[in-house]
From Swiss-Prot:
One of its GO terms (molecular function) is metal ion binding. HAMAP family: Asp_carb_tr_reg. Contains catalytic and regulatory chains. Keywords: Metal-binding, Pyrimidine biosynthesis, Zinc. It comes from Methanococcus maripaludis (strain DSM 14266 / JCM 13030 / NBRC 101832 / S2 / LL). The gene is pyrI. Binds 1 zinc ion per subunit. Disulfide bonds: none annotated. This is Aspartate carbamoyltransferase regulatory chain. Involved in allosteric regulation of aspartate carbamoyltransferase. NCBIfam families: ATCase_reg.
Length: 148
């Protein structure tokens, strides 16, 4: 007999669904979630589209705009569900913004943002194959380093 493990729905908080396969741990790390918050993490769950996805449920957490932008950079197809009293009150797909301030670190060691106390600023030049350019040193970055 096949047994299924059922995960209890959250009452108040956030569900991040359709996270690209195996990226939920990265999303979890960049959100700096308080240790005491109940969290459910599902990895490599089959989706209706025939691919795998990850799901992250966080009881008692409301995401900031910066949090949503960070998620969009890691998993551009993710969906955010805001839950209140056990019901979805808001659902939206993340969207990579045209400009990102202060949440990514420039990989150019000579960039002024790495030498002085200046907030980083990046332009998103291309969304489908992510191209991000530092507005200070003009360098395109290949790897995303979340700065806070």
């Amino acid at each position: 007999m096949k047994r299924e493990l059922k995960v209890k729905p959250i009452e108040n908080g956030t569900v991040i669904d359709h996270i690209s396969g195996s990226k939920a741990l990265k999303v979890y790390k960049i959100l700096n979630i308080e240790e005491k918050l109940p969290i459910t993490l599902a990895l490599n769950v089959p989706s209706k589209k025939g691919v795998t996805k990850d799901i992250l449920k966080i009881e008692g957490l409301e995401l900031s705009k910066d949090d949503v932008n960070k998620i969009a950079l890691i998993s551009p197809d993710a969906t955010i569900n805001i839950i209140k009293e056990g019901k979805v009150i808001k659902k939206f797909k993340v969207d990579i913004p045209k400009r990102i301030d202060g949440i990514i670190k420039c990989t150019n060691p000579n960039c002024i943002t790495n030498k002085e106390n200046i907030e980083s600023r990046f332009s998103i030049e291309q969304k489908n194959t992510l191209k991000i350019r530092c507005e200070y040193c003009e360098k395109f970055i290949n790897s995303i380093i979340i700065s806070k």
